[in-house]
């Protein structure tokens, strides 16, 4: 009787291993595959070119569309080597446009 129980147990364990390895018990989820893009395009913020008049400031030209820190940061990114507080009258600069 002990041999029969041992043989049945071994056969049952082997069946469980076979079933688990061949068929599996956890369903496989088909996850969508996304293709990675080789380059990510760096988009420059929208801008308009304006010729500065005497008395104009960056804030007076752009308006109050965003926070002053963001406006200054975007202006200086569009115009390298130019500080927002040092614009000159008669010169054309790129000013950020906000929706």
From Swiss-Prot:
It comes from Bacillus subtilis (strain 168). The chain crosses the membrane at residues 6-26. It is found in: Secreted, Cell wall; Membrane. It is a single-pass membrane protein. Its main location: secreted. The keyword Secreted applies. SMART domains: LysM (SM00257). CDD domains: LysM. This is Uncharacterized protein YqfZ. GO terms for cellular component: extracellular region; membrane. The keyword Zinc does not apply. It comes from the Bacteria. Residues 48-95 form the LysM domain. Keywords: Cell wall, Membrane, Secreted, Transmembrane, Transmembrane helix.
């Amino acid at each position: 009787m002990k041999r029969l129980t041992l043989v049945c147990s071994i056969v049952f364990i082997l069946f469980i291993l076979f079933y688990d390895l061949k068929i599996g018990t956890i369903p496989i989820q088909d996850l969508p595959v996304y293709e990675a893009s080789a380059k990510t395009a760096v988009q420059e913020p929208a801008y308009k070119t304006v010729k500065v008049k005497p008395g104009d400031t960056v804030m007076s030209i752009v308006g109050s569309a965003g926070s002053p820190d963001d406006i200054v940061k975007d202006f200086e990114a569009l115009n390298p080597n130019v500080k927002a507080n040092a614009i000159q009258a008669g010169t054309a600069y790129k000013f950020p446009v906000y929706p």
